Regions:
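Histidine-centered beta-alpha loop that forms part of the nucleotide-sugar donor binding/catalytic region
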Residues: 47, 74, 100-103
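Bacterial carbohydrate/catabolite-sensing allosteric modules
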Residues: 33-40, 60-65, 80-182
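Conserved ATP-dependent adenylate/AMP-binding module captured primarily in the ANL superfamily
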Residues: 52-56
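Short, Asp-centered acidic motifs that coordinate Mg2+ and/or phosphate
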Residues: 67-69
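Flexible, active-site-proximal loop/turn residues at the rims of small-molecule/cofactor binding pockets
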Residues: 18, 75, 140
Length: 182
C-alpha cells in the first residue's frame, strides 16, 4: 500500500469549468505544453460549472491516477461557497493548485490575475485618453473575477470624480442575459 501511495504517475489532472471559453482553452494549452516539456502527462476534465461533476472528478482521479490537480473552480461551487471537496482531497495528500477562479478558504497554491487592478488600470487608461462615458459589460457578475473587475472599474470612476452612469453598466450572470440587455 505504501508503495502505491508514494508512486509517481507523472500525470497532472486539470479541471476547467468551460472549454468554450477561449481563456480556459489557452490556459490548458499552456499547461499541456509545459507539462510535456517536463515529462508529465495531462488529463483534462471539464466541470461544466457543476459542483457535483467537479467533486466526482476530483474523487475519481485522486485514487492514484494523478500526482496533483490544477483547477479553476466551478460557478456552482463559487455560488454556494462550497469548497469542502477541495479540502478533502488536499487532506488526503493530493496537492491542488487553483488558477483564475479560486477559493480563499482553501489552503493551496493559487495563480491569479489581479482582476481589480487590471480593471482599475484599464479604466484609468481610457480616462487618460479623454474618454468620458466608459461602459462596463459583464456576463460573469456572479463570479469572484467579475465582481473584482466591476469594483476596479467603479473605483477608477470614483478616483477621477466621474459619476456612475448605470445606463451604460450591464452586469449579468450569463452571456444570454447580457445579449438580451444589449
Amino acid at each position: 500500500g505504501l508503495n502505491l501511495k508514494n508512486r509517481k504517475t507523472k500525470t497532472i489532472g486539470v479541471i476547467i469549468p468551460n472549454i468554450l471559453n477561449s481563456f480556459f482553452a489557452k490556459v490548458f494549452s499552456g499547461i499541456e505544453k509545459i507539462a510535456d516539456e517536463k515529462g508529465y502527462n495531462v488529463i483534462m476534465c471539464i466541470s461544466n460549472e457543476s459542483l457535483e461533476k467537479e467533486t466526482h472528478t476530483l474523487e475519481m482521479l485522486s485514487n492514484g491516477t494523478i500526482d496533483g490537480f490544477i483547477v479553476s473552480v466551478s460557478e456552482e461551487a463559487q455560488k454556494n461557497h462550497d469548497y469542502t471537496h477541495f479540502s478533502a482531497i488536499i487532506n488526503d495528500g493530493t496537492p491542488i493548485v487553483m488558477f483564475d477562479r479560486i477559493a480563499d478558504e482553501v489552503e493551496c497554491d493559487k495563480v491569479i490575475v489581479d482582476d481589480y487592478d487590471s480593471a482599475l488600470n484599464s479604466t484609468q487608461h481610457l480616462i487618460n485618453l479623454g474618454c468620458k462615458n466608459i461602459a462596463l459589460f459583464s456576463s460573469i457578475d456572479n463570479l469572484s473575477v467579475g465582481k473584482l473587475r466591476a469594483q476596479g472599474y467603479l473605483q477608477a470612476l470614483k478616483i477621477n470624480d466621474i459619476p456612475v452612469n448605470n445606463d451604460i453598466i450591464l452586469r449579468t450572470d450569463s452571456e444570454d442575459d447580457l445579449n438580451d440587455k444589449i
